[in-house]
From Swiss-Prot:
Record bears the keyword rRNA processing: yes
Similarity comment: family membership: Belongs to the RNA methyltransferase RlmH family.
Gene expressing this chain: rlmH
Reaction equation(s) it catalyzes: pseudouridine(1915) in 23S rRNA + S-adenosyl-L-methionine = N(3)-methylpseudouridine(1915) in 23S rRNA + S-adenosyl-L-homocysteine + H(+)
The protein's name: Ribosomal RNA large subunit methyltransferase H
Disulfide bonds: none
Top-level taxon in the UniProt lineage: Bacteria
GO MF terms, alphabetically ordered: rRNA (pseudouridine-N3-)-methyltransferase activity
GO cellular component: cytoplasm
Species this chain originates from: Kosmotoga olearia (strain ATCC BAA-1733 / DSM 21960 / TBF 19.5.1)
Length: 155
């Protein structure tokens, strides 16, 4: 199954970049994976609703023909690592060829994104930067793969 991750904002922090590269290296034997970054739509001191709307329009345009989209959102469903592994396995077993995850910018997602009929998951009740959310997601994707394959990584 192909995985795609869309996020608002570039990853600039060195240790996170290194972690992202490491997890991509570990995931790639099992999945083709692509990460796409959209630029921020403005500074957070500008009109927040306009920024969220503009960023939301980018997602909707890029994903207009996609059905298998997972929005990472603070009010999404929380899953344990074992439950997330099952979630991924169900997508794989259903014949899904591509699963897309989206990570919002500092202001989150606009209502036009949240109103889509897309699955919403939360990485935690805590809030993360887009960089940290990407790293946590990649770690959980790798962990899910090791769980589903019976590999020693998850205890």
């Amino acid at each position: 199954m192909n995985l795609e991750i869309y996020l608002t904002g570039k990853v600039k922090t060195k240790f996170i970049l290194e972690g992202v590269e490491q997890y991509l290296k570990w995931i790639r034997p099992y999945h083709k994976i692509k990460i796409t970054s959209f630029p921020l739509a403005g500074s957070t001191s500008a009109n927040r609703d306009q920024i969220k709307k503009k960023e939301g329009e980018r997602y909707l345009k890029a994903l207009q023909n996609e059905k298998n989209v997972v929005v990472l959102h603070e009010r999404g469903e929380e899953l344990s690592s074992m439950e997330f592994a099952t979630f991924i396995k169900k997508w794989q077993n259903s014949g899904t060829r591509k699963l897309i995850f989206i990570i919002g910018g500092p202001l989150g997602f606009s209502d036009n994104v949240l109103s889509q009929n897309w699955k919403k998951l939360s990485l935690s009740r805590m809030t993360f930067t887009h960089e940290m959310a990407l790293l946590v997601l990649l770690e959980q994707l790798y962990r899910a793969e090791t769980i589903n394959r019976g590999m020693i990584y998850h205890y």
